[in-house]
Amino acid sequence: KGIITMGSPLEKAACIRYQELLSPNIFNGYGTTESFWNTFLRPYDLPEMAGSAGRSCTDDEVRLVNVYDDRKAEPDDTVPCDNKTEGEIIIKCPNKTTYCYVNNEKATKDKFYKGWMYTGDIGTWNSEQFFTIAGRKDDMIISKGENIYPARIEEILNSHPKVQECIVTGVPDSTRGECVAAYVIKADESPVSYTHLRAH
């Protein structure tokens, strides 16, 4: 018996709880609508690598390439495997992807290049090629020239014991361009302040 989870990263505390209560055999996957799942955390990766999206599936190639404003990175224009430098996740999986959108040439051109699908997801990878999702290119907040990905902040806030769930977005700001706004659902009725959450 085992559990497969998808849709968002499996945070370490949740992983340990699920392993204790339900099953030690947990698989957490990352993928897209166009290409099914493409990376997996396997049971032997957990709980140490919880929070990451795992490594590529057997029949898939997954890379992290540089992001440019005016063009797509070439498939071999990868970022360092240092778990810090962010890039766009690209995927090659011929057995699962059609590499086109029917009757939509523009979307096909935007998404596919030289046999690779450019997901629009931003992440990092380490020397063992474990991927960690940082957010979406489209969701990026630019505040005084700094690129901020909401998913990073959401992960930190969601780890606070007084936070049940949160969502982070950018709001217009006259001096910064955008500021970060977090909408938080408290875990209980006890008070929690902005200062307290910021210190976390």
What do these predicted regions represent?
Residues 61, 68-69, 127-128:
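Residue-level recognition of short loop/turn positions
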Residues 27-34, 53-56, 169-172:
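Beta-strand->loop->alpha-helix junctions that form or flank phosphate-binding loops
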Residues 7, 31, 54, 121, ...:
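Active-site glycine-centered loops adjacent to acidic/histidine catalytic or metal-binding residues
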Residues 55-59, 70-110, 148:
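Conserved ATP/PPi-binding loop(s) of AMP-dependent carboxylate-activating enzymes
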Residues 1-49, 61:
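Gly/Ser/Thr-rich phosphate-binding loop
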Residues 93, 99-100, 110, 122-198:
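AMP-binding/adenylate-forming catalytic core of the ANL superfamily
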Residues 16, 51, 106, 155:
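Active-site phosphate/pyrophosphate- and oxyanion-stabilizing loops and adjacent acidic/basic residues
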